[in-house]
Amino acid sequence: MRDKKIWIFNAGNAFDGNPKWLFMYIVNYRKDITPYWFCYTEETRNYIRKLGYQAFLFKSKMAEKIGSQAGVYVVNQKKEVFQDYLKGITVLNLWHGVGCKTVEKGVTYGFLNERIIKKHIINMDCYQNYQLFLVTSPLMEKHFIKQCDLAEDKIIRAGYPCCFYPGKIKTYDHDILKQKKLPEDTKIAVYAPTYRDASATNFFSQAIPDMEKLVDVLEKNNFLLIFKMHPLMANDFQYQNIKKIYTNCPRVLFWDNANDFYEIFDRIDLAIVDYSSIFYDMLASGVKHFARYIFDYGQENTLRDFALDYMENTCGKICTNFQEFLEVFSKADEDESEEIARIYKKFWEYADEHSLEKIVDAALLFEPDESKKLPTLYSFDIFDTLIGRSTLLPIGVFYHVQDKMRESKLEYPKYIKENFYKIRPWAESNVREYYRKSIVLRKDRRTEITFDLIYERIKELYSLTDE
């Protein structure tokens, strides 16, 4: 019997997102519930312990003990892996952002596609029977039901904890103007681009081609600009290079993603965004001025497909090139309240000051229907079902073909006759890798290969004839 007054939390390798803010709410306002943070790395565990909270590694004996007793597991995504000791726990999925982009089952290409399909096969029982999912408005409810295959009776309707937490949280020094030795009347802007599926490590040079000109504009308009890069884009070569050169520049700050940026939303005067859901979170948190820097809008495979019309469901001055981006800083005080109110209603209609309490109460009251059983999915090896392999190991088929080559009157190269059992899987791996990396070139999103392509590759590498 699981204890609904023991909760465990995780947000990947960081202490942030909706799980972090609900965790803090439990700590400060719900003394009847005992919260624990589970971690994948010692670094994250040690960081949270330094803040004074209980944290354990997933693989530790203590986590196994707590996890086997806990009643609620708070996450911000549809998890790929559930530890065995979590079987039967209520999964409270707070997600990680509203918005226009396709997610989960709506993703049809990119490196995540295969992983998404796999986890929905492996974890479908958990997703369907044990998971509660937070949505923030009727529009987002419809969106996530379709994208994430949700059951309506397992939906929680409220605002995000990271946007509607009742109070302030401070896990680091918020006085960034003092750190940069800038006067108090300095305005603060943030540039927060989203992850690009096709240009994760060569984006920054396209977005910011002239840092000197940017710094001059910031000086002239009395701005500090924060570069808040997506974690998957932080290794962008040009970004790292610019960071080294300008790290001591008083007008730019390269954000450390170890610090939760949401803690200083109330300090932001201007938010420059593109397709990231952080736009909606900043809007909900009271940011008054926005710009949309979308120089790559419409380019193929720049990011995932839109499930909703981007132009209709965002607001702020549109910048399609670097010059227009620079001009934003001199026009940052224009009134956008009417558009902000329109977007707020579309994306945050379920939110109010009681949102976090609604979430907690819904999780406490939820009882999974363990009698509901899903159909069993059977998977078969094609060699066993269609061909009838008689070898003990799969590689035995390749040894068999190799023996036939040695007996053949055809003059196969000596290397092939001695190493076909290795060449055959090498060729398959090579073709599969090519198909994964050539989606744009082939103009075909399929990544599964055919039998003949493997032998075409062997033929090409070893100069074989069709015979």
Range-by-range predicted roles:
Residues 374-391:
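Asp-based phosphoryl-transfer active-site loop
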Residues 243-244, 277-350, 398:
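Catalytic binding pocket for nucleotide-activated donors in carbohydrate/polymer assembly enzymes
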Residues 55-70, 231-280:
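Donor nucleotide-activated moiety binding/catalytic core segment of transferases
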Residues 14-22, 27-28, 146-147, 157-242, ...:
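Conserved catalytic-core segment of nucleotide-activated headgroup transferases in glycan assembly
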Residues 34-50, 215-255:
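Catalytic donor nucleotide-activated moiety binding site of glycosyltransferases and closely related
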Residues 73-102, 258-302:
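A donor-sugar binding/catalytic signature common to diverse glycosyltransferases
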